[in-house]
Amino acid sequence: HVRRGQILSIAKLGDSEAEAIELIAEEGSEIVRKPLQKIRFPKKTILGAIIRNNTMLLPKGIEAINPGESVVVFTLPDDIERVQALFSKKK
């Protein structure tokens, strides 16, 4: 897979198909400044944490991600590109 710059790290979770991805939310992306409950994540994707000011937050539906914040997402390989698109600046 070719992965764009906003992915900081990616790790396979044990023997499962699932992967944990750390991404940065880019200014102008679909994900920033919207309540998480309004974001359409792929069906088998979970937003596990938001890293804000060097502190890990467990996200709630009313929470919004700010540009430049990193997040940890759990997803399946088939959904990585869609997840990445949510965090990438719209062209």
What are these regions (language model features)?
Residues H1-G28:
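Flexible, Lys/Arg-rich cytosolic regulatory linkers and terminal tails that connect or flank
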Residues E22-K89:
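Cytosolic Rossmann-like ligand/nucleotide-binding regulatory domains
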